[in-house]
Amino acid sequence: MGKLIGRISICLLIVCSFWAGTVISDRQRLGEELVRLHVVAASDEKWDQELKLRVRDAVSESLRSDLEKIRDAGEAKRYLQEKLPYIREVAQSTLRFFGCQDTVSVSLCREVFDRRVYDTFSLPAGVYDALRIVIGEGQGKNWWCVVFPGLCIPAASVGTVAVAAGAGFPEGLNNTLIGEAGYELRFGILDAMGKLENVFFGE
């Protein structure tokens, strides 16, 4: 009986170790293979918040066709780094079109993000690469999503899965992000790991 319990314990330990390893791999993949889009409004005034969304739409649309052809996060980051002056020009021109004279700063950087829930998927907390666009003084509310892969474009979960899979995300991670039944614990652990990562990153 004792030997049986020992064997069962060893089997459970192996299974748990494998499962934990896949969760850690998912956390690393999220941090390395997603590029978030972070647009910061000049203020919380209604018009500044509207301008933030106009800039978001203009920048997203200007990059969409090129980013859809990219299947590697490293290539996407290099592309965005090279395009920073162009992105700034798109954002600046959008503001000018609507009569706003605010300046715009654009950068590709590492940022701390809280857990976010979108229409078709959720992202756990953690440190991510981000295309950061700051309008004016940058004192207003933020808009966060994902610029690569284009997870914020599809209107349905099936679209989200297809886009994520095209970027090389494994099925388990896709199911975790769209909230498939049975993956809640996995998402919770990813979120907890991300929050811990945020604490150390902020030190």
Language model: regions and residue ranges:
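Short extracytoplasmic
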Residues: 32, 36-69
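Hydrophobic membrane-insertion alpha-helices, especially the h-region
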Residues: 6-23
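Sec-exported extracytoplasmic/periplasmic mature domains
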Residues: 56, 60-68, 85, 89-96, ...
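Short flanking/linker segments adjacent to small metal-binding domains or redox-active Cys/His motifs
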Residues: 179-203
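Aromatic-capped interface at the extracytoplasmic side
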Residues: 19-33
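Soluble extracytoplasmic domains of inner/organellar membrane proteins
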Residues: 120-183
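Mid-length scaffold segments of soluble, non-membrane domains
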Residues: 77-146
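Internal, well-folded beta-alpha domain core
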Residues: 69-79
